[in-house]
């Protein structure tokens, strides 16, 4: 009698475990990486054009309202308003006429999220290269449009040595 009860119970437990542990496959649409690269490069080009035009509002449109930007040698800027304020300050203080170019190097995408690895080059008005580096931007698609949620950048050029203190 006990064997008759144990067998169905064991079969039931085994069935439950196999069912619970099996992964359900969900169909996801593959991301068209070439189309995505063109879209993100367009955003980078618009960012550079807005910087060159000294339009802080257009530059800040790249970012989500809750974005955080981790720039070199300063505290993170939290929120689009703070990022815009920093951009406006930089634009106001700039008297060089230098401009930057941004290029997509690599993209990783999943669902509504994209991570971009890019390169930047800062040039003088004549087009001579002054500085360069790399950046990483994390985008989320919100209301059908990608917005930068986090970004950070580094310079590839070695830092200039600090001046020696006067003795």
Give the residues covered by each predicted segment:
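A short hydrophobic beta-strand element
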Residues: 111-120
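Short, low-complexity N-terminal intrinsically disordered segments enriched in polar/charged residues
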Residues: 21-62, 160-167
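A solvent-exposed, acidic/Ser-Thr-rich amphipathic alpha-helical stretch
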Residues: 34-38, 56-112
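Bacterial Sec-dependent N-terminal signal peptides
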Residues: 1-31
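Short, cysteine-centered beta-strand-loop-beta hairpins and adjacent loop/turn segments enriched
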Residues: 94-96, 122-130
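Solvent-exposed loop/turn segments at secondary-structure junctions
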Residues: 66, 74-77, 121-123, 154-156
